[in-house]
Amino acid sequence: METIFAQSSSFGKAGVAVFRVSGTKSLEVLKLLTGKSNFKPRFMYYQKLTSPESNDLIDNAMVVYFKAPNSFTGEDVVEIHTHGSKAISIMLTNALLNIPGVRLAEAGEFTKRAFLNNKFDLTAAEGIADLINAETIMQHKQAIRQAGGALEELYNSWRSQLLRIISLLEAYIDFPDEDIPESVLKDVTNTHKTLINTISEYLNDNRKGELLRSGLKLAIIGPPNAGKSSLLNFLMRRDIAIVSNIAGTTRDIIEGHLDIGGYPIILQDTAGIRGESNDVIEQEGIKRAIDSAKKADIKIVMFDAETLDSAVNEDITGLIDENTIVIINKIDLIPENRIFNIENKYRCLKVSIKNNIALPSILKNIEEIAENMAGFTETPYITNERHRHHLKQALVYLKDFNLDNDLVLATEDIRMTMRRIGAITGIIDVEEILGEIFKNFCIGK
């Protein structure tokens, strides 16, 4: 393989910039840049870096050499830590590009090489990508568990059970004259049933892992002037939505990203829902608001306390489900003990966005719903549609398995099940999917 390099840190001004080189020429590259020939693996050296072509000084840097296979990629690897200057990064990049047999790495190529050198499986590689992209504590927790091999361990345990079934069936096929106990087939049947139940239950997870990975969508809906935009601004801790007393001010969906209790929340402020608007643009905004609410994972339905009874309609209440928070806003403008009809049907939070009354209860309720929808369990979740696709296919083959049929055909169903699970971890030949997975990494990883 060619020797590759990339800047692993962000390009721009910083205290330190990190370059990574991987491949058979890594040590040669280090010698050319430093003029030094003796580098002990895993020791950091302070060295002057110069251009091999012009001999111009690039920087005073810290360098370290990792000898294969004891490196991230499993190849000879060199790391170069320079000052975080754009000029230095450009000069070092040009110097490396001018060394024969050395090229710039593609996105995710270092991690791809690590996978190909059996440093980890595909699920761990995807976990590393998720770890890099994690923005909240819960996303980090999920990603680091996956990067640590939790999914690999789970899928390999299923694969081992399938392999055992195959070995038992092939014993029957290859040695028909041998006295093989009937309990063997009973063992096969029990393991088969257990796997069907286990994988079926695992797939029936309400996509918790994928929700945590991508973020839970929260739509704020309700009639005009209920305080939806004010709530969005409060949750975002800045003004991103225009607030006015004019009905129909918000016409398109306004989106913001938030971390609540470690869960990634994608907030969507929508147009006020009312039935009497003659404004074509506002009507389109209302349609989008309803569509957004139907697709949302969590909903906040917000009413103005002064106009609540007249504002309640089926377009709004029809969107309320178990993951909906009903909020009555502007309670500072009504008698303290007033009870609304809607409270007889739904649990409501009474707040005042303007006067900061009971606002922490909104955050608490959002966090509780998010935890219920994407909270952690001991068993790692499916985090990727790719995994789900292969598991569904595996389950089809598993359900097709029937010992009453020809044993060779039955064994093939188990073999295909095992291949589908192997496609998730990369145990089988999966060259066609590697590019799709690793292209989502940043350059230098």
Swiss-Prot record:
Residues 215-371 form the TrmE-type G domain. The keyword Methyltransferase does not apply. GO terms for molecular function: GTP binding; GTPase activity; metal ion binding. Its main location: cytoplasm. K(+) binds at residues 225, 244, 246, 249. GTP binds at residues 225-230, 244-250, 269-272. Its EC number is 3.6.-.-. One of its GO terms (biological process) is tRNA wobble uridine modification. PROSITE patterns: G_TRME. (6S)-5-formyl-5,6,7,8-tetrahydrofolate binds at residues 20, 79, 119, 445. Its cofactor is K(+). InterPro entries: G_TrmE, GTP-bd, GTP-bd_TrmE_N, GTPase_MnmE, MnmE_dom2, MnmE_helical, P-loop_NTPase, Small_GTP-bd. It comes from the Bacteria. Keywords: Cytoplasm, GTP-binding, Hydrolase, Magnesium, Metal-binding, Nucleotide-binding, Potassium, tRNA processing. It is found in: Cytoplasm. SUPFAM superfamilies: P-loop containing nucleoside triphosphate hydrolases (SSF52540), TrmE connector domain (SSF116878). Binds 1 potassium ion per subunit. Mg(2+) binds at residues 229, 250. It holds the Pfam family MMR_HSR1. It is an enzyme of class 3 (hydrolase). PANTHER family: TRNA MODIFICATION GTPASE GTPBP3, TRNA MODIFICATION GTPASE GTPBP3, MITOCHONDRIAL. Exhibits a very high intrinsic GTPase hydrolysis rate. Involved in the addition of a carboxymethylaminomethyl (cmnm) group at the wobble position (U34) of certain tRNAs, forming tRNA-cmnm(5)s(2)U34. Homodimer. Heterotetramer of two MnmE and two MnmG subunits. Belongs to the TRAFAC class TrmE-Era-EngA-EngB-Septin-like GTPase superfamily. TrmE GTPase family. This is tRNA modification GTPase MnmE. The gene is mnmE.
